A protein has these predicted regions:
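Extreme N-terminal starter segment of soluble prokaryotic enzymes
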Residues: 2-6
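Divalent-cation-assisted or electrostatically stabilized phosphate/pyrophosphate-binding catalytic cores
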Residues: 18
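Cysteine-nucleophile active-site neighborhood
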Residues: 50-124
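Short hydrophobic segments within beta-strands
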Residues: 8-10
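Short acidic low-complexity segments
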Residues: 29-40
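Structural signature of beta-strand start/N-cap positions in the alpha/beta core
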Residues: 28, 43, 79-81, 144
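Conserved beta-strand hairpin/beta-sheet module of binuclear metal-dependent hydrolase folds
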Residues: 23-24, 39-53
Length: 206
């Protein structure tokens, strides 16, 4: 029986493009907000576009969804991928439109990108290098990916930082711990690089 990948639908956009990219690399995708479906999924992908607060509130508005994700990922060990704001939601809190609690799976907070140089544009938009750290793991590879964000994940523990990018200074491009991976960039917009990442995610056995 094919493994199932639950793509969490909580009103946070970009579902269709992420779903298409996952199907392109052979995933059996279930788009869902149903806690029982999440509990039985082999893999979980949490997308997200827009503000941290709106995404966090969208998740919390669905009864039992966060608890099901925690049960399947944090307790059950299912491989998890967070994309863009879905990655940021792994943090303890986000500071966009005031402090908002995140999932708290990876210590840190999501802060605005500081524009210290007028030549460096915010939002950080377009293709940029993904430079791996010693904690990258098997899913990530060096390359160029497509970014679109005005806030960044400030991780407390350097061991949780899997990749960096440079935009007027270092920004976290990916975080990882055990079976949890989050990427700030958009794999579904990153052409061959992004499809390769999704394919390796489907093969990942943390």
């Amino acid at each position: 029986m094919a493994e199932t990948t639950a793509l969490i639908d909580y009103g946070a956009g970009n579902l269709h493009s992420v779903e298409n990219a996952l199907r392109t690399v052979g995933a059996s995708v279930t788009v869902t907000a149903d806690p029982d479906t999440v509990r039985t999924a082999d893999r979980i992908v949490l997308p997200g576009v827009g503000s941290f607060r709106a995404c966090a509130e969208g998740l919390r508005a669905i009864p039992g969804l966060i608890e099901a994700m925690e049960e399947r990922v944090e307790v059950g060990g299912a491989p998890f991928l967070g994309v863009c704001v879905g990655m940021q939601l792994l943090a303890d809190r986000g500071l966009e439109h005031g402090a908002t609690p995140g999932l708290g799976w990876i210590a840190g907070e999501v802060r605005a990108i500081e524009q210290t140089d007028p030549a460096i544009k915010v939002p950080h938009m377009g293709w940029n290098d993904v430079a791996l750290t010693a904690h990258a793991g098997p899913v990530l590879e060096e390359g160029e990916a497509y970014f679109l964000h005005s806030f960044h994940f400030a991780a407390e523990n350097p061991a949780d930082i899997a990749a960096m990018t440079d935009h007027g200074g270092g920004l976290v491009a990916a975080v990882a711990r055990d079976n949890v991976l989050g990427v700030q960039f958009h794999p579904e917009k990153s052409q061959a690089y992004g499809l390769g990442l999704l394919e390796r995610f489907l093969q990942w056995r943390p």
